[in-house]
Amino acid sequence: KQVAEHYKEQLEDDVQARLYDALFDAYKANKKAGGSRRDFLLAAAKIPGIYVPSLYEVTYKEDGTIASFAPTEAGVPEKVQKQLIIDMEKEYRAVEAPVVPHIKATQDRVTLEIQRGCIRGCRFCQAGMIYRPTRERDVETLKESARVMLKNTGHEEISLSSLSSSDYSQLKELVNFLIEEFHGKAVNISLPSLRIDAFALDVMSKVQDVKKSSLTFAPEAGSQRLRDVINKGLTEEVILHGAGEAFKGGWNQVKLYFMLGLPTETEDDMKGIAHLAQKIAETYYEVVPKEQRKGKVQINVSTSFFVPKPFTPFQWAPMY
């Protein structure tokens, strides 16, 4: 409620480019006709995917949940219809000449979106819910975009971005292309959002050959009970197996992401984070022969606090 009151309009993220065109057309038509700001807002509200908070009356229950949602003007749709880019080739194209800042930036790399949406169903994840269904981008288009974007920016790293990079069906082909295309040019390939149960050892081993880096996995919760609550879909056996595969592939640095304050969390769940990290560290010494170890294993554990997000099963969950 408090956020909506500060916005004249809100656009559906997935199709902002398409909605901008329709919105600008409505703005120009209203200006040409000498219409008022309210006339423009009324016209904008009729564009599928645009929400104009001032044209709706929302009532709330005592617990803060929505009791009713209704338009206040004739012609304004009762519901704002979600808009989607279905064909990623026809309706979407990556920015091939992104702005390069004059100062050192944290995200100093090319970001290439390889797919949109996620095949998983983690109950805390807003993006995984609102960007359904999963839509992959054509691998040949991605190859050309990568080539052009790196040439235009001069960056030395490219991030293959998605909600779950290892679920992209053409990942191996794309990574092989990037390694061959930029061989000898010291271009690092970053694969964020890896699922430990979909760890592609052959792909990651090739990436590791380009530039040594640590691996990041996100079990999210330390206990099996809590992972089941959030629908993470990971068992301890799968986690340890995936970590073992990474260690056998030559890694000795692993980052682990967890969340605190998840719904139904107990003290035992929090202690489970330390226990799981310890078991992963022990796995390194179990699967890697002493003569093949590259020093001690490094397990870095990072935690963040759960924040309930709209449009997720946990949207009304309290924060601890």
Language-model segment annotations:
Residues 96-123, 150, 191-192, 213, ...:
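N-terminal pre-triad scaffold of radical SAM enzymes
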Residues 1-70, 310-320:
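Glycine-rich beta-alpha loop elements in corrinoid/cobalamin-binding modules
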Residues 125-141:
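Iron-sulfur (Fe-S) cluster-binding segments and ferredoxin-like electron-carrier domains
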Residues 101, 122-130, 221-227:
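Gly-rich Lys/Arg/Thr-decorated short loops/hinges at beta-loop-alpha junctions or inter-strand turns
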Residues 129-131, 229-234, 315-320:
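Short glycine-enriched, charge-decorated loop/helix-capping segments at active-site entrances
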Residues 147-305:
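Conserved SAM/AdoMet-binding glycine-rich loop
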Residues 53, 59-111:
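N-terminal [4Fe-4S]-dependent radical SAM core
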Residues 1, 9, 50, 117-118, ...:
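Conserved structural-core and active-site-/substrate-pathway-adjacent residues in large, well-folded domains
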